């Protein structure tokens, strides 16, 4: 959460080599030591106290199960979204690859289009997050934008700098 740059400023950063040194149980403590007191939503101490239990609950949830559950959810809320003109905008997985063995399902153009086809309704759209999608340098973001044609309901523009394989900062 606070990688120190040569000029003394700090940036958000992700380095797979650092992630590979920890496990879900000690992740909170490890990241807390490096965050300068900052906290991300979902990283609250009361949630992190249950991390081992939560990982156990999701150990058998593969990409297919996760995707099917997402489609089920989006179809279930469709009537309410249409009634109240609510635009849902799914945020891509960040980073765009599995972490600690947890499946990722919204990582690239193929997966975004698959979801738009599975729930083909105006309320169902995308948050175009250039950081999440850009975490995989093979994602062609301009092509993704063209492919989504009107299904982008929100944009979250981030500026990534690559430092190496699965290592970036913003």
Residue locations for each model-derived region?
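Active-site acidic/histidine proton-transfer and metal-coordination neighborhood
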Residues: 1-125
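Gly/Pro-rich active-site loop or hairpin
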Residues: 67, 99-113, 133-170
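Structural preference for beta-strand elements that scaffold enzyme active sites
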Residues: 85-89, 123-127, 151-156, 163
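Glycine/charge-rich catalytic "coupling/switch" loops of P-loop NTPases
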Residues: 130
């Amino acid at each position: 959460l606070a990688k120190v740059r040569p000029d003394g400023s700090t940036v958000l950063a992700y380095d797979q080599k650092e992630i590979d040194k920890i496990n879900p149980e000690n992740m909170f403590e490890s990241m807390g030591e490096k965050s300068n007191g900052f906290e991300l939503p979902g990283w609250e101490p009361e949630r992190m106290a249950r991390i081992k239990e939560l990982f156990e609950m999701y150990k058998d949830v593969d990409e297919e199960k996760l995707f099917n559950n997402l489609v089920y959810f989006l179809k279930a809320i469709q009537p309410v979204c249409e009634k109240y003109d609510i635009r849902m905008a799914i945020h891509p997985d960040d980073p765009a690859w599995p972490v600690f063995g947890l499946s990722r399902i919204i990582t690239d153009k193929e997966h975004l289009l698959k979801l738009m086809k599975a729930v083909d309704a105006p309320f169902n759209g995308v948050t175009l997050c250039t950081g999440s999608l850009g975490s995989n340098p093979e994602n062609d973001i301009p092509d993704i934008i063209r492919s989504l044609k009107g299904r982008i309901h929100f944009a979250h523009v981030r500026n990534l700098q690559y430092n190496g394989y699965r290592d970036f900062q913003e």
